């Protein structure tokens, strides 16, 4: 006589999350083509990530905007279920507040579980912060679980990637193998988010998703022509 089926003896693989925290400058200076291009880039990235999610990995996306004040949009949410709305530009550039929120998300094990892969925090800004940000950045990159995160950054326009703006972005990515991405026109925002997308999707398919590919390696792997548009956008 055959024994009864015992479901408790069988387990189902649960996808391990790869957290992505987007720090997006929505200050007044981002109005016009810049905020329009940013909205499009984020939407395309989420669309691509939702197609790449699988039984063994998912992309856990959090979006923190800073313009007037800093706030976390509904999240963290996996890319498939993300309901991204339209970002609007206005106010100052309270980066310090945004960095604090990012730190809290990563340290909180209810939002970034211990079983998650190494998070990536992505900073996009077009200028110099208007609040006190130095101590919060030090805390993010030097202390706790957040210090182990990968970090990528893009400066939009010369105010962001020259002088004090450049110094801030360089400090943000210190300790990583990334370089500051310079966008001297709104269209290049798309290129940066393609790079971010390639980085996390490459990691999700690798033997060890905690290892971060270098920017140069991603450029070498980038498809061309129609294939590039089909794969990434």
Task: Describe the function of each predicted region.
Residues 1-21, 26-36, 107-108, 113-114:
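Acidic, polar low-complexity linker/tail segments
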Residues 89, 127-175:
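VWA/integrin I-like adhesion module and closely mimicked acidic/polar interface patches used
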């Amino acid at each position: 006589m055959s024994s009864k089926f015992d479901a408790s003896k069988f387990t189902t693989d649960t996808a391990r999350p790869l957290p992505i925290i987007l720090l997006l400058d929505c200050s007044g200076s981002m109005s016009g083509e810049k905020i329009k291009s940013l909205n499009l880039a984020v939407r395309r990235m989420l669309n691509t990530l939702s197609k790449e999610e699988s039984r063994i990995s998912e992309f856990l996306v959090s979006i923190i905007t800073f313009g007037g004040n800093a706030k976390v949009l509904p999240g963290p949410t996996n890319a498939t279920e993300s309901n991204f709305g339209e970002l609007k530009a206005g106010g100052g550039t309270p980066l310090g507040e945004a960095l604090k929120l990012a730190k809290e998300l990563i340290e909180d094990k209810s939002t970034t579980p211990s079983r998650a892969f190494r998070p990536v925090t992505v900073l996009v800004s077009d200028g110099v912060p208007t609040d006190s940000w130095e101590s919060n950045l030090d805390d993010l990159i030097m202390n706790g679980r957040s210090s182990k995160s990968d970090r990528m950054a893009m400066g939009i326009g010369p105010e962001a990637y020259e002088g004090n703006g450049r110094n801030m972005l360089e400090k943000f990515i210190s300790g990583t193998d990334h370089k500051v991405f310079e966008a001297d026109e709104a269209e290049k925002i798309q290129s940066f988010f393609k790079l971010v997308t390639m980085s996390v999707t490459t990691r999700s398919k690798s033997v060890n998703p905690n290892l971060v590919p270098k920017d140069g390696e991603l450029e070498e792997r980038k498809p061309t022509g129609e294939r590039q548009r089909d794969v990434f956008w």
